[in-house]
Amino acid sequence: MKTNHPETYDGRQDHIPSLQTPEIESFTNVYEGKDYTIDFTVPEFTAVCPKTGLPDFGVILVSYIPNKRCIELKSFKEYILSYRNVGIFHEFLVNKILEDVIKSIDPKYLKVIGDYNARGGIKTIVTREYKKP
């Protein structure tokens, strides 16, 4: 969609799906075949607002039911830290994390929530879920 707004950001984040990030490592799930949920929270997430260049602060929540592999947390921490200086919209970050985790561990179920601090009086919460077909 074309707009007459010179401040538009259409097309400026097209590279996000292919953005190079550290590998999310994994380990064998020795309880494969059992459905259990793993939840973790990144309470001090930061990235950069692509419009203002100012930092965005928020909480990232990840919840998944593993299949054959589980996320190795140190590598996930390094993966998350790689966004610290990246200009990325909230919506795209949640989608990118979800797709990268799917590539890494092929979970049975995955939910990623980006719960961002209010900016300009607006609080943003972005959620995406995946269920293995």
From Swiss-Prot:
It is an enzyme of class 1 (oxidoreductase). The keyword S-adenosyl-L-methionine does not apply. Its EC number is 1.7.1.13. It catalyses: 7-aminomethyl-7-carbaguanine + 2 NADP(+) = 7-cyano-7-deazaguanine + 2 NADPH + 3 H(+). It is found in: Cytoplasm. The active site is at C49 (thioimide intermediate), D56 (proton donor). Keywords: Cytoplasm, NADP, Oxidoreductase, Queuosine biosynthesis. GO terms for biological process: queuosine biosynthetic process; tRNA modification. Substrate binds at I71, E72, L73, H90, E91. Pathway: tRNA modification; tRNA-queuosine biosynthesis. GO terms for molecular function: preQ1 synthase activity. One of its GO terms (cellular component) is cytosol. Catalyzes the NADPH-dependent reduction of 7-cyano-7-deazaguanine (preQ0) to 7-aminomethyl-7-deazaguanine (preQ1). Belongs to the GTP cyclohydrolase I family. QueF type 1 subfamily. InterPro entries: GTP-CH-I_C/QueF, NADPH_dep_7-cyano-7-deazaG_red, QueF, QueF_type1. This is NADPH-dependent 7-cyano-7-deazaguanine reductase. It comes from Leptospira interrogans serogroup Icterohaemorrhagiae serovar Lai (strain 56601).
